[in-house]
Amino acid sequence: MKHLFRGLLLVAVILCCNFQQAFAQQMPPIPIDKNVRIGKLDNGLTYYIRKNNLPANRADFYIAQKVGSIQEEENQRGLAHFLEHMCFNGTTHFPGDALKQYLERIGVKFGENLNAYTAIDETVYNISNVPVKTPGAVDSCLLILHDWSNDLTLDPKEIDKERGVINEEWRTRMSAMMRMQE
């Protein structure tokens, strides 16, 4: 009798688990704020613009690219992250250190207001707290976003300098256990 009861209980649990899957529903998408202007350029870039009054006379610029470590082949591991770093080391319109120098001159601090990250499926660059009343600041930030998406200079000297930065960043992120296992 005990075995029969356990068997029936096991069947009931399995059936409940299967029915739960049948009733699972996909969550509806998050609604887009009606104050967001959305458009698509001829080159396929989708943009989102929203006015924000706080902080006053400041703007944030982001470009999210649908590329990350998931697209890399084994012999390309770390390339997306490396290119993210190279975006700050020279573009067509901002050679060498000119991008960082210009933005810091108008009050955008590297690391705090000027940054990027690479994830599994995206690489996101941001310039925040840009003083919009500074002549040319908005146009320059849009030009920087353009350069980040299409016009890196990839100067061999800058590549060699950044290689050491990437290696050090990787080393410090590894846990002590991972280092011991190598």
Describe these PLM feature segments.
Residues 55-57, 65-80, 84-182:
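Active-site-adjacent, His/Asp/Glu-enriched structural segments that form or flank metal-binding
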Residues 1-6:
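Positively charged n-region of N-terminal signal peptides that target proteins for export
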Residues 29-63:
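Mature N-terminal segment immediately following signal peptide/propeptide cleavage
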